[in-house]
Amino acid sequence: MSNTLVLVLNCGSSSLKFAILDATNGDEKISGLAECFGLENARIKWKLRGEKHEASLGAFSAHREAVEYIVNKILVNEPELKGQLIAIGHRIVHGGEKFTHSVIIDDAVLKGIEDCASLAPLHNPAHLIGIRAAQASFPSLPQVAVFDTAFHQSMPDRAYIYALPYKLYREHGIRRYGMHGTSHLFVSREAAKALGKDVNDTNVICAHLGNGASVTAVKGGKSVDTSMGLTPLEGLVMGTRCGDLDPSIIYHLVHQLGYTLDEVNNLMNKQSGLLGISELTNDCRGIEEGYAEGHKGATLALEIFCYRLAKYIASYTVPLGRLDAIVFTGGIGENSDLIREKVLNLLEIFKFEVDSERNKAARFGNQGVITKEGSPIAMVIPTNEEWVIAEDSLRLVNK
């Protein structure tokens, strides 16, 4: 049997998600999370054959130690799994305009990822550390980079050019790039299957809702507009990010209130969104609990979150012309029947009718349509970015 297993690595600034999948069918052999990098309680958790495991990585461990643990402590006891690995696939948040599709990693690709680091300062440097750690531990296996931004490279210039002096784009690449592309690609493709349509003739609006959140208009299988911009800060209200605001607020904070630019950046990225509005938490589950208990801040945060999302969804009918379905995905999108119902009720102009039983059933990994028969379609599709990364890795290695 030919080898089809891919180790997928998703390196964050203080964590590393990993999984080994069969790229042909998405079958997950092992999955895990290494977290708390740089702290005394750095640890790793993984699931193998239905059993959960946890271990300490050692105080102040980080990406390299995590990859070494995967190789020397976990896979050393799984020679069959390790022997069937054909590639290592890496999720890369930002590829700028340099990368319009997935690529096998070489020195030029590493340089390109590094050049894009200013556009994703928390993510791209961590990706590079993870790639180098994987290269050291798996010197004979090809490494593949799969970019979150690549799916959005099909956007027309009217969607990605900001109304700033054009030379800022021409000389410095300042434009909309978008994120979560791998997720939007997967769920839009799965939506076409669920609708029984050819992906090239399917128009959907995908809402990837997690601590980071974005909406994408997908026309005929291609991204034609998306809510995140130059960076992941633009667009929807998120866990700790503000999303859209009047840019003059930055000027006001600096010149009238005495903030430094670094403080403003931290405020908008880490102190705003659901956390900032509610003054309670960035976790949507906590927001929903507060809402149920009548907490004013949580209620306001939830209402603003849903209102902003509904406005974006409505606006994305413009580039589509015809809407076949709204697709909810991501941790919040897949599990919050409350938010889905609120958003669809705000879109009453489109005559969505939520089926309460279907909506409640479509949680915890369950896929399904959540609107009534005869109503315009809204559905939940659990995302699987790891499978897309594994598929692309296998395809490139077999080229």
Curated annotation (Swiss-Prot):
Its EC number is 2.7.2.1. Keywords: ATP-binding, Cytoplasm, Kinase, Magnesium, Metal-binding, Nucleotide-binding, Transferase. Its cofactor is Mg(2+); Mn(2+). Belongs to the acetokinase family. Homodimer. Gene3D superfamilies: 3.30.420.40. NCBIfam families: ackA. Substrate binds at R91. Its main location: cytoplasm. ATP binds at K17, H208, L209, G210, N211, G212, D283, C284, R285, G331, I332, G333, E334, N335. Mg(2+) binds at N10, E385. GO terms for molecular function: acetate kinase activity; ATP binding; magnesium ion binding. Mg(2+). Can also accept Mn(2+). One of its GO terms (biological process) is acetate metabolic process. This is Acetate kinase. Catalyzes the formation of acetyl phosphate from acetate and ATP. Can also catalyze the reverse reaction. InterPro entries: Ac/propionate_kinase, Aliphatic_acid_kin_short-chain, Aliphatic_acid_kinase_CS, ATPase_NBD. It is found in: Cytoplasm. Pfam families: Acetate_kinase. The record marks H180, R241 as: Transition state stabilizer. Pathway: Metabolic intermediate biosynthesis; acetyl-CoA biosynthesis; acetyl-CoA from acetate: step 1/2. The keyword Cell wall biogenesis/degradation does not apply. The active site is at D148.
